[in-house]
Amino acid sequence: MLKILLPTLMLIPLTWLSKNKWLWINTTTYSLLISITSLPMLYHPMDLGYNFNNSFSLDSLSSPLLVLSCWLLPLMIMASQNHLNKESLMRKKLYLTMMVILQSSLIIAFTSSELMMFYILFETTLIPTLIIITRWGNQNERLNAGIYFLFYTLVGSLPLLVALLTMNKNLGTLHILMNSILINQLNYTLSNSTLWYACMTAFMIKMPLYGLHLWLPKAHVEAPIAGSMVLAAILLKLGGYGIMRISLFTEPMTMHLLYPFIILSMWGMIMTSSICMRQTDLKSLIAYSSVSHMALVIIAALIQSTTSFMGATILMVAHGLTSSMLFCLANTNYERIHSRTMILARGLQLILPLMTTWWLTASLANLALPPTINLLGELMIITASFSWSNFSILLLGLNTVITALYSLYMLTTSQRGKFTHHMTSLYPSFTREHMLMTLHIMPLILLSLNPKYILGMTYCKYSLMKTLDCESKH
Protein backbone atom coordinates (compact mmCIF):
# COMPACT_ATOMS: atom_id res chain seq x y z
CA MET A 1 0.00 0.00 0.00
CA LEU A 2 2.81 2.40 0.85
CA LYS A 3 4.20 2.07 -2.67
CA ILE A 4 1.09 3.98 -3.83
CA LEU A 5 0.55 6.28 -0.85
CA LEU A 6 4.11 7.61 -0.43
CA PRO A 7 4.64 8.56 -4.11
CA THR A 8 1.24 10.29 -4.05
CA LEU A 9 2.26 12.34 -1.01
CA MET A 10 5.55 13.20 -2.74
CA LEU A 11 3.51 14.95 -5.42
CA ILE A 12 3.14 17.86 -2.95
CA PRO A 13 6.87 18.79 -2.81
CA LEU A 14 7.13 18.13 -6.57
CA THR A 15 4.31 20.64 -7.15
CA TRP A 16 5.85 23.35 -4.99
CA LEU A 17 9.38 22.88 -6.37
CA SER A 18 8.33 22.92 -10.04
CA LYS A 19 8.63 26.09 -12.09
CA ASN A 20 5.66 27.45 -14.00
CA LYS A 21 6.91 26.06 -17.32
CA TRP A 22 7.22 22.50 -15.98
CA LEU A 23 4.36 22.45 -13.46
CA TRP A 24 1.75 20.64 -15.58
CA ILE A 25 4.25 18.32 -17.28
CA ASN A 26 5.84 17.19 -13.99
CA THR A 27 2.60 16.61 -12.07
CA THR A 28 0.75 14.91 -14.95
CA THR A 29 3.64 12.57 -15.81
CA TYR A 30 4.36 11.65 -12.19
CA SER A 31 0.69 11.02 -11.33
CA LEU A 32 0.30 8.92 -14.49
CA LEU A 33 3.25 6.78 -13.39
CA ILE A 34 1.55 6.29 -10.00
CA SER A 35 -1.68 5.21 -11.70
CA ILE A 36 0.19 2.69 -13.89
CA THR A 37 1.98 1.37 -10.77
CA SER A 38 -1.40 0.81 -9.10
CA LEU A 39 -2.80 -1.37 -11.93
CA PRO A 40 -1.25 -4.66 -10.64
CA MET A 41 -3.24 -4.12 -7.44
CA LEU A 42 -6.43 -5.13 -9.22
CA TYR A 43 -7.24 -8.11 -7.04
CA HIS A 44 -6.99 -11.42 -8.84
CA PRO A 45 -9.92 -13.66 -7.78
CA MET A 46 -7.82 -16.82 -7.86
CA ASP A 47 -5.22 -15.37 -5.49
CA LEU A 48 -5.97 -16.99 -2.14
CA GLY A 49 -4.00 -14.58 0.04
CA TYR A 50 -5.63 -11.43 1.41
CA ASN A 51 -3.32 -8.47 1.88
CA PHE A 52 -4.07 -7.65 5.53
CA ASN A 53 -2.06 -5.89 8.23
CA ASN A 54 -2.88 -3.76 11.26
CA SER A 55 -3.38 -0.55 9.29
CA PHE A 56 -4.14 -1.38 5.67
CA SER A 57 -6.01 -4.11 3.85
CA LEU A 58 -6.65 -4.76 0.21
CA ASP A 59 -9.32 -7.08 -1.11
CA SER A 60 -11.42 -7.48 -4.22
CA LEU A 61 -13.85 -4.71 -3.17
CA SER A 62 -11.33 -2.00 -2.31
CA SER A 63 -8.78 -2.66 -5.09
CA PRO A 64 -10.98 -1.59 -8.08
CA LEU A 65 -11.93 1.63 -6.29
CA LEU A 66 -8.31 2.27 -5.29
CA VAL A 67 -7.11 1.84 -8.88
CA LEU A 68 -9.98 4.05 -10.11
CA SER A 69 -8.88 6.81 -7.70
CA CYS A 70 -5.27 6.60 -8.89
CA TRP A 71 -6.32 6.48 -12.55
CA LEU A 72 -8.39 9.66 -12.30
CA LEU A 73 -5.76 11.90 -10.65
CA PRO A 74 -3.72 12.54 -13.85
CA LEU A 75 -6.99 12.98 -15.76
CA MET A 76 -8.14 15.65 -13.29
CA ILE A 77 -4.82 17.47 -13.65
CA MET A 78 -5.06 17.33 -17.46
CA ALA A 79 -8.65 18.60 -17.43
CA SER A 80 -7.81 21.55 -15.13
CA GLN A 81 -4.99 23.05 -17.19
CA ASN A 82 -7.06 25.45 -19.28
CA HIS A 83 -9.32 26.32 -16.33
CA LEU A 84 -6.33 27.49 -14.25
CA ASN A 85 -4.47 29.20 -17.08
CA LYS A 86 -5.21 32.73 -15.83
CA GLU A 87 -4.55 31.94 -12.16
CA SER A 88 -1.31 32.90 -10.44
CA LEU A 89 1.41 30.27 -9.96
CA MET A 90 0.76 30.14 -6.20
CA ARG A 91 -2.93 29.37 -6.72
CA LYS A 92 -2.18 26.70 -9.31
CA LYS A 93 0.12 24.96 -6.83
CA LEU A 94 -2.44 25.28 -4.04
CA TYR A 95 -5.12 23.75 -6.29
CA LEU A 96 -2.87 20.80 -7.14
CA THR A 97 -1.98 20.37 -3.45
CA MET A 98 -5.69 20.14 -2.55
CA MET A 99 -6.16 17.44 -5.19
CA VAL A 100 -3.19 15.44 -3.89
CA ILE A 101 -4.44 15.68 -0.27
CA LEU A 102 -7.87 14.51 -1.42
CA GLN A 103 -6.31 11.66 -3.39
CA SER A 104 -4.21 10.54 -0.40
CA SER A 105 -7.28 10.61 1.87
CA LEU A 106 -9.21 8.45 -0.60
CA ILE A 107 -6.36 5.93 -0.89
CA ILE A 108 -6.21 5.49 2.91
CA ALA A 109 -10.03 5.41 3.18
CA PHE A 110 -10.38 2.60 0.64
CA THR A 111 -7.54 0.55 2.17
CA SER A 112 -8.01 1.15 5.91
CA SER A 113 -8.53 -2.09 7.80
CA GLU A 114 -10.17 -0.39 10.79
CA LEU A 115 -13.63 1.15 10.63
CA MET A 116 -12.76 4.16 12.81
CA MET A 117 -9.85 5.04 10.53
CA PHE A 118 -12.21 4.68 7.58
CA TYR A 119 -14.65 7.09 9.27
CA ILE A 120 -11.91 9.67 9.93
CA LEU A 121 -10.70 9.55 6.32
CA PHE A 122 -14.32 9.53 5.12
CA GLU A 123 -14.70 12.91 6.85
CA THR A 124 -11.24 14.16 5.84
CA THR A 125 -12.19 14.05 2.15
CA LEU A 126 -14.74 16.77 2.92
CA ILE A 127 -12.11 19.47 3.62
CA PRO A 128 -10.14 19.60 0.32
CA THR A 129 -13.34 19.08 -1.70
CA LEU A 130 -15.00 21.99 0.10
CA ILE A 131 -11.97 24.24 -0.54
CA ILE A 132 -11.90 23.28 -4.24
CA ILE A 133 -15.63 24.04 -4.66
CA THR A 134 -15.75 27.31 -2.71
CA ARG A 135 -12.45 28.77 -3.94
CA TRP A 136 -12.29 27.72 -7.59
CA GLY A 137 -15.98 27.52 -8.49
CA ASN A 138 -17.27 29.80 -11.24
CA GLN A 139 -20.33 31.57 -9.76
CA ASN A 140 -21.13 33.23 -6.44
CA GLU A 141 -23.59 30.41 -5.67
CA ARG A 142 -20.56 28.18 -4.98
CA LEU A 143 -20.62 29.34 -1.32
CA ASN A 144 -24.23 28.17 -0.96
CA ALA A 145 -23.29 24.86 -2.61
CA GLY A 146 -20.38 24.49 -0.18
CA ILE A 147 -22.68 25.02 2.81
CA TYR A 148 -25.13 22.39 1.50
CA PHE A 149 -22.28 19.94 0.93
CA LEU A 150 -20.76 20.59 4.36
CA PHE A 151 -23.92 20.30 6.45
CA TYR A 152 -25.47 17.33 4.64
CA THR A 153 -22.23 15.36 5.03
CA LEU A 154 -21.53 16.35 8.65
CA VAL A 155 -25.08 15.89 9.97
CA GLY A 156 -25.36 12.50 8.26
CA SER A 157 -21.99 11.31 9.60
CA LEU A 158 -22.70 12.00 13.28
CA PRO A 159 -24.98 8.93 13.77
CA LEU A 160 -22.30 6.78 12.10
CA LEU A 161 -19.72 7.92 14.67
CA VAL A 162 -22.09 7.04 17.54
CA ALA A 163 -22.79 3.63 15.97
CA LEU A 164 -19.07 2.87 15.56
CA LEU A 165 -18.34 3.87 19.17
CA THR A 166 -21.17 1.56 20.31
CA MET A 167 -19.78 -1.33 18.24
CA ASN A 168 -16.30 -0.67 19.64
CA LYS A 169 -17.64 -0.73 23.21
CA ASN A 170 -19.49 -4.01 22.65
CA LEU A 171 -16.75 -5.81 20.69
CA GLY A 172 -13.53 -4.16 21.82
CA THR A 173 -12.29 -3.71 18.24
CA LEU A 174 -13.36 -2.23 14.92
CA HIS A 175 -10.84 -4.14 12.80
CA ILE A 176 -12.50 -5.53 9.66
CA LEU A 177 -10.91 -8.99 9.94
CA MET A 178 -11.63 -9.32 13.68
CA ASN A 179 -15.21 -8.08 13.31
CA SER A 180 -16.01 -10.76 10.75
CA ILE A 181 -14.98 -13.34 13.38
CA LEU A 182 -16.34 -11.72 16.55
CA ILE A 183 -19.75 -10.43 15.48
CA ASN A 184 -22.61 -12.78 16.13
CA GLN A 185 -25.86 -12.34 14.25
CA LEU A 186 -27.82 -9.42 15.68
CA ASN A 187 -31.29 -9.92 17.09
CA TYR A 188 -34.12 -7.95 15.51
CA THR A 189 -34.59 -5.44 18.35
CA LEU A 190 -35.21 -1.70 18.50
CA SER A 191 -31.65 -0.92 19.62
CA ASN A 192 -30.11 -3.00 16.84
CA SER A 193 -32.46 -1.42 14.29
CA THR A 194 -31.34 2.02 15.48
CA LEU A 195 -27.71 0.92 15.16
CA TRP A 196 -28.33 -0.20 11.56
CA TYR A 197 -30.06 3.05 10.61
CA ALA A 198 -27.24 5.07 12.22
CA CYS A 199 -24.64 3.16 10.19
CA MET A 200 -26.50 3.54 6.91
CA THR A 201 -27.55 7.21 7.15
CA ALA A 202 -24.10 8.66 6.40
CA PHE A 203 -23.60 6.39 3.39
CA MET A 204 -27.12 7.00 2.04
CA ILE A 205 -26.46 10.76 2.09
CA LYS A 206 -23.10 10.26 0.40
CA MET A 207 -24.51 8.06 -2.40
CA PRO A 208 -26.97 10.01 -2.36
CA LEU A 209 -30.39 8.45 -1.70
CA TYR A 210 -33.35 10.26 -3.30
CA GLY A 211 -34.66 12.80 -0.79
CA LEU A 212 -31.17 13.34 0.65
CA HIS A 213 -29.68 14.33 -2.70
CA LEU A 214 -30.18 18.13 -2.77
CA TRP A 215 -26.50 18.86 -2.09
CA LEU A 216 -25.28 16.92 -5.13
CA PRO A 217 -26.64 19.01 -8.06
CA LYS A 218 -25.60 22.21 -6.28
CA ALA A 219 -22.08 20.94 -5.59
CA HIS A 220 -21.65 19.57 -9.13
CA VAL A 221 -22.90 22.68 -10.89
CA GLU A 222 -20.71 25.09 -8.91
CA ALA A 223 -17.55 22.96 -8.67
CA PRO A 224 -14.64 23.40 -11.10
CA ILE A 225 -13.91 20.55 -13.48
CA ALA A 226 -11.63 18.58 -11.11
CA GLY A 227 -14.17 18.97 -8.29
CA SER A 228 -16.99 17.63 -10.48
CA MET A 229 -14.84 14.72 -11.67
CA VAL A 230 -13.75 13.58 -8.21
CA LEU A 231 -17.25 14.08 -6.75
CA ALA A 232 -18.97 11.96 -9.40
CA ALA A 233 -16.25 9.37 -9.90
CA ILE A 234 -14.89 8.70 -6.40
CA LEU A 235 -16.65 10.46 -3.51
CA LEU A 236 -20.07 8.99 -4.31
CA LYS A 237 -18.45 5.53 -4.35
CA LEU A 238 -17.38 5.98 -0.70
CA GLY A 239 -21.08 5.61 0.13
CA GLY A 240 -21.47 2.35 -1.80
CA TYR A 241 -18.20 1.01 -0.40
CA GLY A 242 -19.35 1.84 3.15
CA ILE A 243 -22.75 0.17 2.70
CA MET A 244 -21.17 -3.02 1.37
CA ARG A 245 -18.58 -3.10 4.18
CA ILE A 246 -20.92 -2.29 7.10
CA SER A 247 -23.85 -4.42 5.96
CA LEU A 248 -21.73 -7.57 6.34
CA PHE A 249 -21.34 -6.77 10.06
CA THR A 250 -25.01 -6.01 10.74
CA GLU A 251 -26.56 -9.28 9.60
CA PRO A 252 -29.44 -10.14 9.53
CA MET A 253 -30.73 -6.58 10.17
CA THR A 254 -30.39 -5.62 6.50
CA MET A 255 -32.83 -8.37 5.54
CA HIS A 256 -35.52 -6.86 7.80
CA LEU A 257 -34.92 -3.15 7.23
CA LEU A 258 -34.08 -2.83 3.54
CA TYR A 259 -37.64 -2.44 2.16
CA PRO A 260 -38.17 1.33 2.68
CA PHE A 261 -34.71 2.11 1.28
CA ILE A 262 -35.17 -0.06 -1.81
CA ILE A 263 -38.64 1.35 -2.50
CA LEU A 264 -37.32 4.91 -2.10
CA SER A 265 -34.35 4.12 -4.35
CA MET A 266 -36.58 2.71 -7.09
CA TRP A 267 -38.95 5.67 -6.87
CA GLY A 268 -36.03 8.11 -6.79
CA MET A 269 -34.43 6.39 -9.76
CA ILE A 270 -37.52 7.08 -11.89
CA MET A 271 -37.95 10.63 -10.53
CA THR A 272 -34.35 11.76 -11.07
CA SER A 273 -34.29 10.22 -14.56
CA SER A 274 -37.48 12.15 -15.35
CA ILE A 275 -35.97 15.36 -13.92
CA CYS A 276 -33.08 14.93 -16.38
CA MET A 277 -35.59 15.28 -19.24
CA ARG A 278 -36.50 18.78 -18.01
CA GLN A 279 -32.99 20.14 -17.45
CA THR A 280 -31.49 23.02 -19.41
CA ASP A 281 -28.21 23.09 -17.46
CA LEU A 282 -25.80 20.46 -18.78
CA LYS A 283 -23.89 19.84 -15.52
CA SER A 284 -27.16 19.64 -13.57
CA LEU A 285 -28.43 16.96 -15.96
CA ILE A 286 -25.27 14.88 -15.48
CA ALA A 287 -25.57 15.32 -11.68
CA TYR A 288 -29.17 14.04 -11.61
CA SER A 289 -28.07 11.19 -13.87
CA SER A 290 -25.52 10.25 -11.18
CA VAL A 291 -28.29 10.13 -8.54
CA SER A 292 -30.27 7.77 -10.78
CA HIS A 293 -27.32 5.42 -11.34
CA MET A 294 -26.33 5.41 -7.67
CA ALA A 295 -29.89 4.36 -6.78
CA LEU A 296 -29.15 1.12 -8.65
CA VAL A 297 -26.01 0.63 -6.54
CA ILE A 298 -28.02 1.17 -3.31
CA ILE A 299 -30.57 -1.45 -4.44
CA ALA A 300 -27.83 -3.96 -5.30
CA ALA A 301 -25.85 -3.38 -2.08
CA LEU A 302 -28.95 -3.89 0.10
CA ILE A 303 -30.22 -7.03 -1.68
CA GLN A 304 -26.89 -8.68 -0.80
CA SER A 305 -26.99 -11.56 -3.23
CA THR A 306 -23.87 -12.76 -5.04
CA THR A 307 -24.98 -11.27 -8.36
CA SER A 308 -26.07 -7.94 -6.86
CA PHE A 309 -22.72 -7.38 -5.11
CA MET A 310 -20.89 -8.09 -8.37
CA GLY A 311 -23.19 -5.71 -10.25
CA ALA A 312 -22.80 -2.95 -7.64
CA THR A 313 -18.98 -3.12 -7.79
CA ILE A 314 -18.94 -3.07 -11.59
CA LEU A 315 -21.44 -0.21 -11.85
CA MET A 316 -19.49 1.91 -9.34
CA VAL A 317 -16.34 1.63 -11.46
CA ALA A 318 -18.21 2.06 -14.76
CA HIS A 319 -20.19 5.07 -13.57
CA GLY A 320 -17.03 6.66 -12.17
CA LEU A 321 -15.41 6.66 -15.61
CA THR A 322 -18.58 7.54 -17.56
CA SER A 323 -19.71 10.47 -15.41
CA SER A 324 -16.17 11.83 -15.24
CA MET A 325 -15.99 11.73 -19.04
CA LEU A 326 -19.34 13.53 -19.34
CA PHE A 327 -18.18 16.29 -16.99
CA CYS A 328 -14.97 16.67 -19.04
CA LEU A 329 -17.04 17.06 -22.20
CA ALA A 330 -19.33 19.58 -20.48
CA ASN A 331 -16.21 21.50 -19.47
CA THR A 332 -14.93 21.60 -23.06
CA ASN A 333 -18.25 23.18 -24.07
CA TYR A 334 -18.11 25.66 -21.18
CA GLU A 335 -14.57 26.77 -22.02
CA ARG A 336 -15.70 27.69 -25.54
CA ILE A 337 -19.21 29.15 -25.17
CA HIS A 338 -18.94 30.21 -21.48
CA SER A 339 -22.35 28.81 -20.63
CA ARG A 340 -23.71 25.53 -19.27
CA THR A 341 -27.06 25.97 -21.06
CA MET A 342 -27.40 23.14 -23.57
CA ILE A 343 -29.43 25.01 -26.17
CA LEU A 344 -26.67 27.62 -26.55
CA ALA A 345 -24.23 24.89 -27.57
CA ARG A 346 -26.38 23.50 -30.39
CA GLY A 347 -24.71 23.15 -33.75
CA LEU A 348 -21.29 22.38 -32.27
CA GLN A 349 -21.18 19.28 -34.46
CA LEU A 350 -20.47 21.54 -37.44
CA ILE A 351 -17.42 23.13 -35.78
CA LEU A 352 -16.06 20.32 -33.58
CA PRO A 353 -17.06 17.03 -35.28
CA LEU A 354 -14.52 14.92 -33.35
CA MET A 355 -15.85 16.26 -30.03
CA THR A 356 -19.34 15.23 -31.17
CA THR A 357 -17.99 11.70 -31.67
CA TRP A 358 -16.81 11.71 -28.04
CA TRP A 359 -20.23 13.03 -26.96
CA LEU A 360 -21.93 10.17 -28.80
CA THR A 361 -19.57 7.62 -27.23
CA ALA A 362 -20.11 9.00 -23.70
CA SER A 363 -23.91 9.14 -24.14
CA LEU A 364 -24.02 5.53 -25.34
CA ALA A 365 -21.81 4.47 -22.41
CA ASN A 366 -24.19 6.31 -20.06
CA LEU A 367 -27.17 4.32 -21.34
CA ALA A 368 -25.15 1.08 -20.95
CA LEU A 369 -24.62 0.08 -24.56
CA PRO A 370 -22.19 -2.78 -25.28
CA PRO A 371 -19.21 -3.19 -25.38
CA THR A 372 -18.90 -0.99 -22.28
CA ILE A 373 -18.71 -2.49 -18.78
CA ASN A 374 -21.82 -0.46 -17.79
CA LEU A 375 -24.00 -3.06 -19.53
CA LEU A 376 -22.68 -5.94 -17.41
CA GLY A 377 -23.18 -3.99 -14.17
CA GLU A 378 -26.76 -2.98 -14.96
CA LEU A 379 -27.68 -6.47 -16.23
CA MET A 380 -26.41 -8.07 -13.02
CA ILE A 381 -28.31 -5.59 -10.85
CA ILE A 382 -31.54 -6.03 -12.85
CA THR A 383 -31.18 -9.84 -12.65
CA ALA A 384 -30.60 -9.73 -8.88
CA SER A 385 -33.52 -7.33 -8.37
CA PHE A 386 -35.84 -9.53 -10.43
CA SER A 387 -34.83 -12.55 -8.34
CA TRP A 388 -35.59 -10.53 -5.20
CA SER A 389 -38.97 -9.25 -6.44
CA ASN A 390 -40.69 -9.76 -9.79
CA PHE A 391 -42.37 -6.35 -9.50
CA SER A 392 -39.02 -4.54 -9.60
CA ILE A 393 -38.58 -5.34 -13.31
CA LEU A 394 -41.30 -2.80 -14.17
CA LEU A 395 -39.52 0.11 -12.49
CA LEU A 396 -36.04 -0.95 -13.59
CA GLY A 397 -37.24 -1.41 -17.18
CA LEU A 398 -38.90 2.01 -17.14
CA ASN A 399 -35.70 3.54 -15.77
CA THR A 400 -33.68 1.96 -18.60
CA VAL A 401 -36.01 3.54 -21.19
CA ILE A 402 -35.89 6.99 -19.55
CA THR A 403 -32.07 6.76 -19.28
CA ALA A 404 -31.86 6.16 -23.03
CA LEU A 405 -34.22 9.10 -23.64
CA TYR A 406 -32.32 11.67 -21.58
CA SER A 407 -28.94 10.49 -22.87
CA LEU A 408 -30.07 11.06 -26.46
CA TYR A 409 -31.81 14.31 -25.43
CA MET A 410 -28.51 15.53 -23.98
CA LEU A 411 -26.64 14.60 -27.16
CA THR A 412 -29.09 16.14 -29.64
CA THR A 413 -29.70 19.34 -27.65
CA SER A 414 -26.03 20.12 -27.06
CA GLN A 415 -24.57 19.04 -30.43
CA ARG A 416 -27.19 18.94 -33.18
CA GLY A 417 -29.59 21.57 -34.44
CA LYS A 418 -29.32 24.99 -36.02
CA PHE A 419 -26.03 26.81 -35.49
CA THR A 420 -26.30 29.78 -33.09
CA HIS A 421 -24.79 33.08 -34.25
CA HIS A 422 -23.14 34.02 -30.94
CA MET A 423 -20.45 31.37 -31.53
CA THR A 424 -18.17 33.24 -33.91
CA SER A 425 -14.60 32.59 -32.75
CA LEU A 426 -14.28 29.18 -31.11
CA TYR A 427 -10.85 27.64 -30.82
CA PRO A 428 -10.50 24.03 -32.02
CA SER A 429 -10.25 20.94 -29.86
CA PHE A 430 -6.82 20.09 -28.47
CA THR A 431 -4.83 16.85 -28.39
CA ARG A 432 -4.92 17.09 -24.58
CA GLU A 433 -8.73 16.88 -24.65
CA HIS A 434 -8.79 13.91 -27.01
CA MET A 435 -6.22 12.09 -24.87
CA LEU A 436 -8.39 12.82 -21.83
CA MET A 437 -11.47 11.23 -23.46
CA THR A 438 -9.43 8.25 -24.68
CA LEU A 439 -8.15 7.53 -21.16
CA HIS A 440 -11.77 7.55 -19.92
CA ILE A 441 -13.32 5.32 -22.57
CA MET A 442 -10.43 2.86 -22.96
CA PRO A 443 -10.84 1.20 -19.49
CA LEU A 444 -14.63 0.96 -20.00
CA ILE A 445 -14.14 -1.11 -23.15
CA LEU A 446 -11.07 -3.10 -22.06
CA LEU A 447 -12.65 -4.16 -18.75
CA SER A 448 -15.61 -5.62 -20.64
CA LEU A 449 -13.16 -8.09 -22.24
CA ASN A 450 -12.09 -9.42 -18.82
CA PRO A 451 -14.39 -8.11 -16.07
CA LYS A 452 -13.32 -10.57 -13.34
CA TYR A 453 -10.86 -8.04 -11.87
CA ILE A 454 -13.68 -5.75 -10.76
CA LEU A 455 -16.36 -8.30 -9.85
CA GLY A 456 -15.83 -7.72 -6.13
CA MET A 457 -15.94 -9.78 -2.96
CA THR A 458 -18.59 -12.34 -3.84
CA TYR A 459 -16.88 -13.48 -7.05
CA CYS A 460 -13.61 -13.83 -5.14
CA LYS A 461 -15.27 -16.03 -2.49
CA TYR A 462 -17.01 -18.10 -5.17
CA SER A 463 -13.68 -18.65 -6.99
CA LEU A 464 -11.98 -19.55 -3.71
CA MET A 465 -14.66 -22.12 -2.82
CA LYS A 466 -14.47 -23.58 -6.34
CA THR A 467 -10.67 -23.87 -6.12
CA LEU A 468 -10.77 -25.54 -2.70
CA ASP A 469 -13.49 -27.91 -3.91
CA CYS A 470 -11.36 -28.95 -6.91
CA GLU A 471 -8.32 -29.47 -4.68
CA SER A 472 -10.31 -31.62 -2.23
CA LYS A 473 -11.54 -33.83 -5.09
CA HIS A 474 -8.00 -34.40 -6.33
Curated annotation (Swiss-Prot):
Listed GO MF terms: NADH dehydrogenase (ubiquinone) activity; ubiquinone binding
Keywords noted in UniProt: Electron transport, Membrane, Mitochondrion, NAD, Respiratory chain, Translocase, Transmembrane, Transmembrane helix, Transport, Ubiquinone
Cellular component, GO annotation: mitochondrial membrane
Record's keyword annotation contains Phosphoprotein: no
Pfam families (UniProt xref): Oxidored_q5_N, Proton_antipo_M
Topology within the bilayer: Multi-pass membrane protein
Top-level class of the enzyme under EC nomenclature: translocase
Domain of life (superkingdom): Eukaryota
Catalysed reactions, semicolon-separated: a ubiquinone + NADH + 5 H(+)(in) = a ubiquinol + NAD(+) + 4 H(+)(out)
Record-level GO BP terms: ATP synthesis coupled electron transport; electron transport coupled proton transport
EC code: 7.1.1.2
Transmembrane parts of this sequence: 22-42, 60-80, 93-113, 114-134, 145-165, 195-215, 224-244, 257-277, 284-303, 308-330, 350-370, 391-411, 435-455
Compartments where located: Mitochondrion membrane
Family stated for the protein in its record: Belongs to the complex I subunit 4 family.
PANTHER family from the UniProt entry: NADH-UBIQUINONE OXIDOREDUCTASE CHAIN 4
Stored NCBIfam families: NDH_I_M
Function: Core subunit of the mitochondrial membrane respiratory chain NADH dehydrogenase (Complex I) that is believed to belong to the minimal assembly required for catalysis. Complex I functions in the transfer of electrons from NADH to the respiratory chain. The immediate electron acceptor for the enzyme is believed to be ubiquinone.
Identification of the protein by name: NADH-ubiquinone oxidoreductase chain 4
Organism expressing this protein natively: Didelphis virginiana
